[in-house]
Amino acid sequence: MFGSFGVLIALMMFKNQHPLNAQLLFVWTLMEAYTVGVVCASYTAAGQGRIVVEALVLTASIFAVLTAYTFQSKRDWSFMEAGLMSSLWLLIFWGLFSWFVPSLAGGLYSLFGALVFSGFIIFDTWQITERFGYDDHILASITLYLDILNLFLYILQFLSRDRH
């Protein structure tokens, strides 16, 4: 996890230096895939493999619908930025606090996380089409990848809340 974060920082620093940026994106993607693979394998080993598939289908469906809506709407979604960033900080602090108080409304936390990253999918898709330049493909990949990945993990957490 910390290695992945380190590669992500390096990726952000060298986002415009080709081919290093593509190589770092490849390494970071492999590290994230391994991490998510371990999470999914642990659910499967616990007899909850069906939940992983349900979370995958829900994530893909939500992403497709929100992306289509964002492209179709032609709205300026910049007003969402402050609220999404505030919500992200709330999720971070809530997650840290829940380490000390584990029963702190886990279902509500995961549902809120899924809603926040659904909002990020709309905002970042709009940002890619309206704010990002032609050379920002690495940054665009990272933002949507993180949105989809986090949405999947929060949905997975929400679906498994009563099945532990």
Labelled PLM ranges:
Residues 1-164:
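A hydrophobic alpha-helical transmembrane-helix feature that marks the membrane cores
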